[in-house]
């Protein structure tokens, strides 16, 4: 039987990716990022304060919040604010986004400022956390470029780019950038976060159906590296535009 993906893509093909800067008016950085039908609004907000544990240390902080609009999926879900608390998945994802972005920042160069990345999923079709990281990096870059332009900081605090992509084993084949039909029916699902120097920042991998082998893991990481190269090129092109 010939292997095929629901979308018709090849195994090593990303969905169409778009990065639209300055999507909203008020934030220091804002991006609408689209991975196929997954769309995430990422805004970067700068505040001249830091958490209590950093006061007086001359360091900045980068953090993130993540949420999904009630009808970003096939059926409506209540807003977490209406429930009175954030869910475990939400907390896990926003911590992941924050960790990923802190990995590309010299916090001493930022000074005692906090940059908060708000990542709001407008439409979900798989890979929302990886899209959020990829788009939030561009919003973060716009925010720090504005700080430099205004003379608020002297040294550029970004020490590299960060992006993320999903990979998985779908019907026995390693594939890149899973959409929802694949994500909901895969044997292995993995999220990979990397910097543009080829370093891995975070790997999140789970065997959903059956355990994966070392050779399959190597194949998944090779796919992720290929996709990451394309994503870094798209980020650079967006920031140059």
Curated annotation (Swiss-Prot):
EC number annotated for this UniProt entry: 2.7.7.56
Alphabetical UniProt keywords: Nucleotidyltransferase, RNA-binding, rRNA processing, Transferase, tRNA processing, tRNA-binding
Database matches in Pfam families: RNase_PH, RNase_PH_C
GO BP terms in the entry: rRNA catabolic process; rRNA processing; tRNA processing
Gene3D superfamilies for the chain: GHMP Kinase, N-terminal domain (3.30.230.70)
Catalytic activity as recorded in UniProt: tRNA(n+1) + phosphate = tRNA(n) + a ribonucleoside 5'-diphosphate
Binding site for phosphate: 89, 127-129
Entry GO MF terms: 3'-5'-RNA exonuclease activity; tRNA binding; tRNA nucleotidyltransferase activity
Similarity comment: Belongs to the RNase PH family.
Biological role: Phosphorolytic 3'-5' exoribonuclease that plays an important role in tRNA 3'-end maturation. Removes nucleotide residues following the 3'-CCA terminus of tRNAs; can also add nucleotides to the ends of RNA molecules by using nucleoside diphosphates as substrates, but this may not be physiologically important. Probably plays a role in initiation of 16S rRNA degradation (leading to ribosome degradation) during starvation.
Subunit structure: Homohexameric ring arranged as a trimer of dimers.
Name the UniProt record assigns to this protein: Ribonuclease PH
Species annotation: Xanthomonas euvesicatoria pv. vesicatoria (strain 85-10)
Organismal lineage: Bacteria, Pseudomonadati, Pseudomonadota, Gammaproteobacteria, Lysobacterales
């Amino acid at each position: 039987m010939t292997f095929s993906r629901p979308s018709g893509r090849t195994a090593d093909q990303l969905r169409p990716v778009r990065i639209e800067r300055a999507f909203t008016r008020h934030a220091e950085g804002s991006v609408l990022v689209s991975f196929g039908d997954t769309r995430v609004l990422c805004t970067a907000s700068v505040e001249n304060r830091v958490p209590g544990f950093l006061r007086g240390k001359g360091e900045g902080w980068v953090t993130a919040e993540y949420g999904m609009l009630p009808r970003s999926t096939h059926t409506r879900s209540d807003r977490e604010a209406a429930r009175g608390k954030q869910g475990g998945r939400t907390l896990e994802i926003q911590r992941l986004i924050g960790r990923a972005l802190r990995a590309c920042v010299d916090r001493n160069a930022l000074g005692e400022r906090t940059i908060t990345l708000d990542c709001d999923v407008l439409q979900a079709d798989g890979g929302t956390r990886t899209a959020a990281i990829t788009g939030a990096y561009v919003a973060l870059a716009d925010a720090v470029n504005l700080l430099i332009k205004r003379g608020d900081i002297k040294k550029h605090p970004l020490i590299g780019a960060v992006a993320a992509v999903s990979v998985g084993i779908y019907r026995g084949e390693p594939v890149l950038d899973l959409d929802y039909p694949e994500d909901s029916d895969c044997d292995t699902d993995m999220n990979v976060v990397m910097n543009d120097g080829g370093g891995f920042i975070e790997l999140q991998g789970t065997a959903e159906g059956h355990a994966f082998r070392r050779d399959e893991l190597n194949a998944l990481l090779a796919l992720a590296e290929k996709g990451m190269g394309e994503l870094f090129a798209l980020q650079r092109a967006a920031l140059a535009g």
